[in-house]
Amino acid sequence: MDGFAVVVGAGSFRVEGGVRFPHRWTAEGVSVGAEFTGAHLLHLAAAGCVLNDLYREAAGLGVRLDGVRVTASGGFDTESWASTGIAYGIELDSPASAEQQAALIEQVDRVAEIPRAIRAGAPVERR
């Protein structure tokens, strides 16, 4: 699943040359590296949600995050243009222990709203 790759970063992992957006969890904002296609935007939604939820859940657990980078990619069936899946990776810059970081990542994988919605599927209708 290496197609349609995107990257979002915050803190010490901001994306050089990426587009910057304000972010409620970091003063410097979030940077995004992605092309503007439907596939990239779908993957960006998942990656951006995971990044946000890492900061949200870390605050609740008392885990300091100095930087977060989330990458996501996936494929599409060229006959139906249905997603063939999305894979994402996480890098953390944190003084927290490896165990605390792993627990944070597991928690976010359970609660991140966009990945959960994609996993569950949802009807999309034109109005």
What are these regions (language model features)?
Residues 1-45, 52-127:
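Extended beta-strand/beta-hairpin segments
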